[in-house]
Each structure stands twice: as structure tokens, then as C-alpha cells.
Amino acid sequence: MKVVVQRVKRAAVTNKSIHNEIDKGFCLLVGIGKDTTEADIDAVAKKIINARLFEDENGKLNLNIQQVEGQILSISQFTLYADVRKGNRPGFSNSKNPEEANVLYEKFNTALKAYDVEVKTGEFGTDMEVEIINDGPVTIIYESQDGKII
């Protein structure tokens, strides 16, 4: 599992059927790989919720998303598993098949919500417009394999 976490002042996702937006918080680009398990979902969700990526009164990254009452915008992003080693067109054989990936993506969002953080989402498997106003910028990539952060 790969998740790109961007600290944002505002973020929005739109397609033909939905429009969701958040203010201060995280915009997550969530990739579900062919080897992603529920243990990875839990490990990454916990790590992101506890990540101290917001400044305290002294300007140090000391506060987590719960402490700043931030929100999360979670967007599925299978292209995080692109294989670009051969040719000029990326391959996506390292991504989990869409049906299984959607189940794990929903479980990931449920795991985040279990920490009493407001989570909004894009629509799995559709083309979307994503609008992000980064804060910092602070961008961190979290990866998990076999239930462990790598």
C-alpha cells in the first residue's frame, strides 16, 4: 500500500456525480497494490492519524490531525503503482484488481474514520478533478508491506 499525504489548507474533488471538499487537513492519494492486505490498511491508517505534521505554537511539527481538528480528503490513485521501467507507457500490473482494491480502499477510509476524524472521499474508479492548496508544502509518502511501514 502506498499513500501520498499532503498537508493542505483546502482540497476538493469533483466528478460528474460528487463534489467533496475539506479545509485544513490532509489530502491522501491512496494506492492499493496487488499485495496490500488489511494489516497494511490498519498500519497506514494508524501512522497517518498519529503523524505529527502540523506546527505547534513554537513552529515545530508536533501536532497530529486530531489535535488540530483537521479533515481528510481520501482519493483512490491506482497510478501510484505504475511500472515505468520499460517503454514510455506505464504498466499497472502491480495494482490490485479494481474490485478487491475498492473493498480495501473503503476499509482504509473506515479505519481512518474510527479515529473520529472527518473523512471525505472521491469516487473510486472514476476520472476526477482534484484541487489542492498545499500548506508548507508538507508531502510524505507512507508505504506498508506485510502489515509493516516500510
From Swiss-Prot:
- Where does the record say this protein resides? Cytoplasm
Task: Kindly list the GO CC terms recorded for this protein.
Answer: cytoplasm
Keyword line:
Cytoplasm, Hydrolase, RNA-binding, tRNA-binding
Location of motif Gly-cisPro motif, important for rejection of L-amino acids in this chain is 136-137
| GO annotation, biological process | D-amino acid catabolic process
Q: Which reaction does it catalyse?
A: glycyl-tRNA(Ala) + H2O = tRNA(Ala) + glycine + H(+); a D-aminoacyl-tRNA + H2O = a tRNA + a D-alpha-amino acid + H(+)
For this chain, the family text in UniProt reads: Belongs to the DTD family.
Explain the purpose of this protein: An aminoacyl-tRNA editing enzyme that deacylates mischarged D-aminoacyl-tRNAs. Also deacylates mischarged glycyl-tRNA(Ala), protecting cells against glycine mischarging by AlaRS. Acts via tRNA-based rather than protein-based catalysis; rejects L-amino acids rather than detecting D-amino acids in the active site. By recycling D-aminoacyl-tRNA to D-amino acids and free tRNA molecules, this enzyme counteracts the toxicity associated with the formation of D-aminoacyl-tRNA entities in vivo and helps enforce protein L-homochirality.
- Domain remarks in the Swiss-Prot or TrEMBL record: A Gly-cisPro motif from one monomer fits into the active site of the other monomer to allow specific chiral rejection of L-amino acids.
Q: What is this protein called?
A: D-aminoacyl-tRNA deacylase
Native species? Staphylococcus haemolyticus (strain JCSC1435)
